[in-house]
């Protein structure tokens, strides 16, 4: 199955929407093993941790369908 290409900004928006409301920022980075991964940044450590756990799960699912486009 061919993966659809998405820009980092598009993937960031998808991950942020799937996580939901909160005061955090999502960035997408290349990952040699999975293709790409999401990193969460924010001011509240508990929220960052909660969102990062969710982002890891979401990215694992989305990596099966989307490829990071430069």
Predicted segments, located by residue:
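Detector for the mature cores of small, proteolytically processed
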Residues: 25, 30-70
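N-terminal acidic leader/helix
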Residues: 1-27
């Amino acid at each position: 199955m061919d993966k659809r290409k998405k820009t980092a900004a598009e993937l960031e928006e998808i991950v942020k929407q799937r996580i939901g409301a909160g005061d955090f920022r999502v960035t997408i980075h290349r990952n040699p093993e999975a293709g790409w991964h999401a990193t969460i940044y924010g001011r509240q450590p508990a929220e960052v941790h909660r969102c990062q756990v969710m982002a890891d799960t979401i990215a694992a699912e989305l990596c099966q369908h989307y490829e990071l486009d430069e």
